[in-house]
Amino acid sequence: KEGAFFFNQDGVTPNDELFNVFGTAITSMCSKPANELVVGESAEGAATYYINIGGNIKENFSVNLEDMEEESEEQTMVCSCATGAPFGQAAVVGVPLAAVVDMANLEDGVNTVTAYGADGFGQALPLQYCLDRDALLVYEVNGEKLKSETGPSAQLWMPETVARYFTRNVVDIKLTAEEQVPDVQSVDPTYRNKIEIMNSADGCVFFAGNSITFEGVADDLGSPIEAIEFSFDGGETWTECPTEGATADKWVNWQFETS
């Protein structure tokens, strides 16, 4: 099928939609529910911008992310469930985890980092994995400061990583030396080709010669999208549209116009 194809990697999922998409899925499949994204609703716990750092370090200490604002970074990245279809993209602002680690006097052999939420939830990750991906302690999502019922709140985000590791309401970070570096869960192969029709209508009629625009977003967590393919005859033939230059850390936002 002939047509015009366009793509970029721009755009974000509005915060209310992020909660609607992940609010229930995250409970069972990803990290804890992101209640702090919902305007007017409170999250559980007593999280603030103060985070306690401990583990296998010479001296425990606390940091206030507000005092590290000059080191903050802004990134746009995908948040994607490992065992479900939901995913979204957000513009986040936060302090690099590396900046906090640099402040710690590590003991020999430290290879693991675990961020704990106010409810005690935490997922161990290889320290080098997080540093290589420029993990952020995020305090702003899509221009909105994160809040808990007691004040400011922080979340752990990192590119090309499933959302179960995006711990909410972070209050403690442990840097530890483990005998075995923890494995990192990747996306379930069943969900690599995530397809969801977000908008549809019954009884639509398109007349010959009318211009029709199809649009959507695509993500293959940890791998760049190489092409979007279309079929208008039940899969007998396919039109391949390359997405040259697309990177793995963001979704592909595409449009295909035909008549």
Residue ranges and their predicted role:
Residues 1-232, 236-259:
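N-terminal intrinsically disordered, low-complexity segments enriched in P/E/S/T
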